[in-house]
Amino acid sequence: MKGKFSIALMLSACFSASASDSVHWGYEGSGDPAHWGKLSPDFSLCETGKNQSPVNIQQALNAQHDPLQLAFQSGTQQIINNGHTVQVNVSSGNTLLLDNETFALQQFHFHAPSENEIDGKQFPLEGHFVYKNADGALTVIALMFQEGAANPQLATAWQQIPAHVDQAEDVRTPIAIQALLPTSLNYYRFSGSLTTPPCSEGIRWLVLDHPVTASAEQINQFSSVMHHANNRPIQPLNGRIIIH
C-alpha cells in the first residue's frame, strides 16, 4: 500500500518541507521564519517575494465568484508527522473544479495557531487542503477551527498520528474529508505563496469564511505533538486584492 503514496510523499516535500534536505528550517531559533530567506538561495522568495502567504484578510472586495465545486471519493490515506506538521496524504479521486481547471487533492495538513487571519482574528488551528492540476499549479483551501465541540474527524486523525517523526502510517480508519468541511463553502480568494520554504508564489488561496470547531483538548493534542507553534507570521499584501 505504501507504494501508492510514493508520489504523494514526494509532493509533501514541496508543501511542508525543505526544497533541500540539507537545509534545516523550522519555527524556532536560527531556522525560524525570519531567517528562512537566508538559509538557502532556494528560499530567497521567503524574504524577497511580494505575494507571500499568510495574510490578514481585511476589506475584501465583494464580487461574484463561482461556488466551490468539490468532489470526494473514499480511498486510502497515509498520515505522517514530518516535524513541521501533521499531514495526511490521500489517494486520487478528490477534486476541485476552479477556473475551468481540475485540481486533485494531494494532502492536507495543519497549523497551530492559524496562519491566515480574518479581520485581525487568529484562530487556534488551521487546515490546508493542497490541490494540484495537470500543469503542476497549486490551489490551497484553508479551513479555520475555533474552540468548541470536539471534531469527530480530527479525533479520527489524531488517534492515528505516528509516534515518531517522519514515520508514515497507513490510516486504518479514513478521515471523511467532506465531513471535515463546513456546510457553507463561501470563501475569500487571493494570490499567494506556500507558507513554508521555498515560499513559491503563484498559489491560488481559497480561505473558507465559516470555521468549524475543535475542542480545547484536540487543539492542545496537536500542539503537544508539534512541541512548538508551526505558523508563519502574517505577510504584507503589497497591493493585492482579496475577493469575497
Curated annotation (Swiss-Prot):
UniProt-annotated catalytic positions: 84 (proton acceptor)
Annotated positions binding Zn(2+): 109, 111, 128
Localization (cell): Periplasm
Primary localisation category: periplasm
Pfam families xrefs: Carb_anhydrase
Disulfide bonds: 46-199
Coiled-coil regions, chain positions: none
Binding site for substrate: 195-196
Ranges where the Alpha-carbonic anhydrase domain occurs: 23-244
Alphabetical UniProt keywords: Disulfide bond, Lyase, Metal-binding, Periplasm, Signal, Zinc
Domain of life: Bacteria
Cofactors required: Zn(2+)
Matching PROSITE patterns: ALPHA_CA_1, ALPHA_CA_2
Transmembrane portions of the chain: none
Signal peptide residues on this chain, from the entry's feature table: 1-19
One GO cellular component, as annotated: periplasmic space
EC number(s) recorded for this UniProt protein: 4.2.1.1
Catalytic activity: hydrogencarbonate + H(+) = CO2 + H2O
GO MF: carbonate dehydratase activity; zinc ion binding
PANTHER family documented for this protein: CARBONIC ANHYDRASE
Family membership: Belongs to the alpha-carbonic anhydrase family.
Function: Reversible hydration of carbon dioxide.
Name of the molecule in the record: Carbonic anhydrase
Organism this protein belongs to: Pectobacterium atrosepticum (strain SCRI 1043 / ATCC BAA-672)
Gene behind this protein: cah
